[in-house]
A protein has these predicted regions:
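Aromatic-lined carbohydrate-binding surfaces of glycoside hydrolases
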Residues: 1-186
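Hydrophobic/aromatic ligand-binding patch that stacks against planar heteroaromatic rings
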Residues: 30, 205, 230
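Conserved short secondary-structure transition element at the edge of the structured enzyme core
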Residues: 232-234
Length: 234
């Protein structure tokens, strides 16, 4: 996860504890020397607190880029400076990462209990399905220009019936409908933390629809074992 690295393009939001760009480049080189493929994960859509740190007066930075200014968490897709800002950062990320095969865009958990989404009138008018699709496709097209594929978390694109643990694509917004329109070479990283399930309908559905998929486990008892066994059968 690389959004907190001290990129030149994001100098306005650096944190004192962030990794230096030099250290990141050295880490990538170490990985390459040891036959490890680097897949940088740069948080987008939700989980964008990196974009809104507080200044010395305790005020949030970049509030024009926040969807909900009362709780800056997701970004405002209608702000014309958003994507140039992201693109400049990603250009740096992929160069420092040795021009990787994949870019992980995160893109999960856009709904936060403390933040409204969408909050801005112009984005409410667009509708969440269009916002989600257009944003994914911006990264898809960016990656294609740089001979990469994108990888993303899957929760917004599966229903609660498909994943009782984290499926956020059901009513009222029905975001799972968006996956019908998405290119089938987007790798879905199916994150599942619960150790109790032995069957994963979300993974079956995504695989049946043709998406490459990676099972992303956590550390709860039986989670790794159950998810691995299921994915091996797919």
């Amino acid at each position: 996860e690389v959004e907190y690295v001290k990129w030149d393009a994001t100098s306005d939001v650096h944190q004192p504890w962030g990794m230096s760009k030099e250290d990141y480049i050295n880490l990538v080189k170490w990985c390459q020397d040891n036959y490890i493929d680097v897949v940088p994960l740069f948080q987008t859509f939700g989980h964008c607190g990196w974009m809104f740190p507080k200044d010395e007066n305790g005020n949030f930075k970049n509030l024009d880029l926040a969807e909900d200014v009362n709780y800056p968490y997701a970004y405002n897709v209608s702000n014309p400076r958003l994507y140039p800002y992201i693109e400049k950062a990603l250009d740096e990320v992929i160069e420092a990462s040795g021009y990787p095969k994949y870019l992980h865009i995160g893109h999960d958990e856009v709904f936060h209990p403390k933040a409204e989404f969408p909050a801005r009138p112009e984005n409410k008018k667009l509708g969440i399905q269009k916002i989600l699709y257009d944003d994914i496709m911006w990264y898809y097209n960016y990656a294609n220009k740089h001979n990469m594929k994108i990888m993303m978390w899957h929760d917004l694109l599966v229903t609660p019936e498909e994943s009782t643990e984290n499926g956020a694509g059901g009513a009222p917004h029905n975001l799972a409908e968006v996956r019908k329109k998405l290119p089938k070479d987007i790798t879905m990283a199916a994150w599942r933390y619960d150790g109790r399930p032995v069957d994963f309908p979300d993974i079956t559905a995504l695989r049946n629809e043709g998406f490459p998929l990676i099972g992303a486990s956590w550390y709860e008892d039986n989670n790794i074992e159950n998810l691995t066994k299921f994915c091996l059968k797919q």
